[in-house]
Structure formats: structure tokens, C-alpha cells
Amino acid sequence: MKLCVTFLLILVILPSVTGEKSSKRTLSGAALRGDWGMCSGIGQGCGQDSNCCGDMCCYGQICAMTFAACGP
């Protein structure tokens, strides 16, 4: 348990010691903005198949239900 806590502390402190700047696109930032894990429903906008919920596909930038698998 102590080893785990020590490892996590090192991961948190190491970037500040090396002078590495943090990214604005972090997991906590995504959670605060509310866009973490969101998907588009039927008729909603999308950019690719992975933006649509479930087995829906992105056709013409709109999520739609299909009988066949999503295309390439």
C-alpha cells in the first residue's frame, strides 16, 4: 500500500520538477467540461462512427441506426 502511494506521489510531483507543462486536455478537465464519455443519439451530429452511441453509424454527419455494420 505504501509503495502504491509513493508511486502515485512520484507521478504527480515528477512533471513539476522536470518543468514539464501540463496539457489543457486532461481527464479531469474533460470531466469538468462534461464531454467525457458522451455519445450522440439518433439524428444528432457526429464526425465518425465512434461518436455515435451503441451500434449506430455516422452517415452524412448524423447518427443513424443500420441493419449492416458501419462502413470504413
From Swiss-Prot:
Molecular-function GO term, any one: ion channel regulator activity
Tissue specificity comment: Expressed by the venom duct.
Extent of the signal sequence: 1-19
Disulfide-bond pairs as recorded: 39-53, 46-58, 52-63, 57-70
Record keyword Signal present: yes
Residue ranges of coiled coil: none
Keyword Disulfide bond: yes
Entries under InterPro entries matching the protein: Conotoxin-I_CS (IPR013141)
Keywords: Cleavage on pair of basic residues, Disulfide bond, Ion channel impairing toxin, Neurotoxin, Secreted, Signal, Toxin
PROSITE patterns in the cross-refs: I_CONOTOXIN (PS60019)
Primary location: secreted
Recorded GO CC terms: extracellular region
Subcellular location: Secreted
Propeptide: 20-32
Notes on the domains: The cysteine framework is XI (C-C-CC-CC-C-C).
Entry similarity comment: Belongs to the conotoxin I1 superfamily.
Name of the protein described by the UniProt record: Conotoxin Ep11.1
